[in-house]
């Protein structure tokens, strides 16, 4: 893994810093093309050191894997920057909920939390949501850990338990989330989610239902594909209906009343039954969110034993890319006025169609290497590519796998597409970056180069 390799070869930092400094000279375009500051090439700190983040100190240990590239993004809060496309989506959803769901005194039923710290405990991110200790979503290769006890949240669901425990029963949470992932136009290590939760008391759920006073929220039975063991079928079906109706109205508000929707059964550790919503957009079915009836064990542990509820989570980038026809997720981090001014509208519901910036030519280079005998994770390589290449890297494709018939060693060949969003890249500058990546892969990942 990157961490163990760094601890074995800390001297490699000095070389990479020197190399990166050479590459970055003469590149002054801060929005997209400049190499990160030289120190950012050191992807982790050794155990015993401390990382300062958002005014707090976090001791490093063998679980720490937060890259400096990601650290520079923490606190940007794109969803709170006025007229940013992610802010527009958030405001449209918030406006819809404020208008459609009103409490007894005319105030909004749903409260909104859009400035919660992205640093959470592993208990908040996993255990509070009933995610098993051996669940693959906990893997170091998929998350950004500050240390064994703290991490950058992988989903806004990490705040569900705390808000329920505080006595809230209807709320939206919006924030940046962090996951180690592949590199292409649809994936970025930081993206933004909007989470919603609503709980119902027996009176609230069955109000207006004929003979509703005789119905119950809970029973002791067996779990099935349609309900949890503690829920009555009547309660589950009403919660499911309210959830799907709420989301159908939201999507109609965003995309128009003629939108075609379908529901797909799925699995999440913290809801059952669980669903994904797909929309038919220009003839293509697109998955836009996940949702379900909240696991009663989670609700009970937060102190709301007399209530049943639903939850959903959607990606703001996903919706914005569909609604505004934005082709590349990197654009959300662009500071180019040609991008941002397209979303400076007086009415948040005004239709916007993104006008592409000039498409500069790509520079494509391949990298091949033999994998180490153990501890290689593909997301470690992707993280290294992002750290060395920054936002110049448009995508990375694994184009070939080969197992040597005699040594049984495995070789990977990746095709890396470099493209600047604001100017043409030269072969020379890409060659310097690519060479630094090759050397970093050998020294930090323990691979054997085939270049």
UniProtKB/Swiss-Prot annotation:
It catalyses: tRNA(Phe) + L-phenylalanine + ATP = L-phenylalanyl-tRNA(Phe) + AMP + diphosphate + H(+). Changing residue 391 to V: In COXPD14; results in a decrease in affinity for Phe causing a decrease in aminoacylation activity; affects the stability of the enzyme, leading to a significant decrease in overall charging capacity. It is an enzyme of class 6 (ligase). Its EC number is 6.1.1.20. GO terms for biological process: phenylalanyl-tRNA aminoacylation; tRNA aminoacylation for protein translation; tRNA processing. Coiled coil: none annotated. Signal peptide: none annotated. Keywords: Acetylation, Aminoacyl-tRNA synthetase, ATP-binding, Disease variant, Hereditary spastic paraplegia, Ligase, Mitochondrion, Neurodegeneration, Nucleotide-binding, Primary mitochondrial disease, Protein biosynthesis, Transit peptide. GO terms for molecular function: ATP binding; phenylalanine-tRNA ligase activity; tRNA binding. It is found in: Mitochondrion matrix; Mitochondrion. PROSITE patterns: AA_TRNA_LIGASE_II, FDX_ACB. GO terms for cellular component: cytoplasm; mitochondrial matrix; mitochondrion. It holds the Pfam family tRNA-synt_2d. Substrate binds at residues 157-160, 179, 186-188, 193-195, 287, 312. The modification N6-acetyllysine is found at residue 202. Residues 358-450 form the FDX-ACB domain. InterPro entries: aa-tRNA-synth_II, aa-tRNA-synth_II/BPL/LPL, Fdx_antiC-bd, Fdx_antiC-bd_sf, Phe-tRNA-synth_IIc_mito, Phenylalanyl-tRNA_Synthase. It is linked to Combined oxidative phosphorylation deficiency 14: A severe multisystemic autosomal recessive disorder characterized by neonatal onset of global developmental delay, refractory seizures, and lactic acidosis. Biochemical studies show deficiencies of multiple mitochondrial respiratory enzymes. Monomer. PANTHER family: PHENYLALANINE--TRNA LIGASE, MITOCHONDRIAL, PHENYLALANYL-TRNA SYNTHETASE. Belongs to the class-II aminoacyl-tRNA synthetase family. Is responsible for the charging of tRNA(Phe) with phenylalanine in mitochondrial translation. To a lesser extent, also catalyzes direct attachment of m-Tyr (an oxidized version of Phe) to tRNA(Phe), thereby opening the way for delivery of the misacylated tRNA to the ribosome and incorporation of ROS-damaged amino acid into proteins. This is Phenylalanine--tRNA ligase, mitochondrial. It comes from Homo sapiens (Human). The gene is FARS2.
């Amino acid at each position: 893994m990157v961490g163990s390799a760094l601890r074995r070869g800390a001297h490699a930092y000095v070389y990479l810093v020197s190399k990166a400094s050479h590459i970055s000279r003469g590149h002054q375009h801060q929005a997209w093309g400049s190499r990160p500051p030289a120190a950012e090439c050191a992807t982790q700190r050794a155990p015993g050191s401390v990382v300062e983040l958002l005014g707090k100190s976090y001791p490093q240990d063998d679980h720490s894997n937060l890259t400096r590239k990601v650290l520079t993004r923490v606190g940007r809060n794109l969803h709170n920057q006025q007229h940013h496309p992610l802010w527009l989506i958030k405001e449209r959803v918030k406006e819809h909920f404020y208008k459609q769901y009103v409490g007894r005194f005319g105030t909004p039923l749903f409260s909104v939390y859009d400035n919660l710290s992205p640093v959470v405990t592993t208990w908040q991110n996993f255990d509070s949501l009933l995610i098993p200790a051996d669940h693959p979503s906990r893997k170091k290769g998929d998350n950004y850990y500050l240390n064994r006890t703290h991490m950058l949240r992988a989903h806004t669901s990490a705040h569900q338990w705390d808000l329920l425990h505080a006595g809230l029963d209807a709320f939206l949470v919006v924030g940046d989330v962090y996951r180690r992932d592949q590199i292409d136009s649809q994936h970025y290590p930081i993206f933004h989610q909007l989470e919603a939760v609503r709980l119902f008391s027996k009176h609230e759920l069955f109000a207006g239902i004929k003979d509703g006073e005789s119905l119950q929220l809970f029973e002791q039975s067996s779990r099935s594909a349609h309900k949890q063991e503690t829920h009555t079928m009547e309660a589950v079906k009403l919660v499911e209906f309210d959830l799907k109706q709420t989301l159908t109205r939201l999507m109609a508000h965003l995309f128009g009343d003629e939108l075609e929707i379908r529901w797909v059964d799925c699995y999440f550790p913290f809801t059952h039954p669980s669903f994904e919503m797909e929309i038919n957009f220009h003839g293509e079915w697109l998955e836009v969110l996940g949702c379900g009836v909240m696991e009663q064990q989670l609700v009970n542990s937060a102190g709301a034993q007399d209530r049943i509820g639903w939850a959903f989570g959607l990606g703001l980038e996903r919706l914005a890319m569909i609604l505004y026809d934005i082709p590349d997720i990197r654009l959300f981090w662009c500071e180019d006025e040609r991008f941002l001014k397209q979303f400076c509208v007086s009415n948040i519901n005004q239709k916007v169609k993104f006008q592409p910036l000039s498409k500069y030519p790509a520079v494509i280079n391949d990298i091949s290497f033999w994998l180490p005998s153990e501890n290689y994770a593909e997301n470690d390589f992707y993280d290294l590519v992002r750290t060395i290449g920054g936002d110049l890297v448009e995508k990375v494709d694994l184009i070939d796998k080969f197992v040597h018939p005699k040594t049984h060693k495995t070789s990977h060949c990746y095709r890396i597409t470099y493209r600047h969003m604001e100017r043409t890249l030269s072969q020379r500058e890409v060659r310097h970056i690519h060479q630094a990546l090759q050397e970093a892969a050998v020294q930090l990942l323990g691979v054997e180069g085939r270049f």
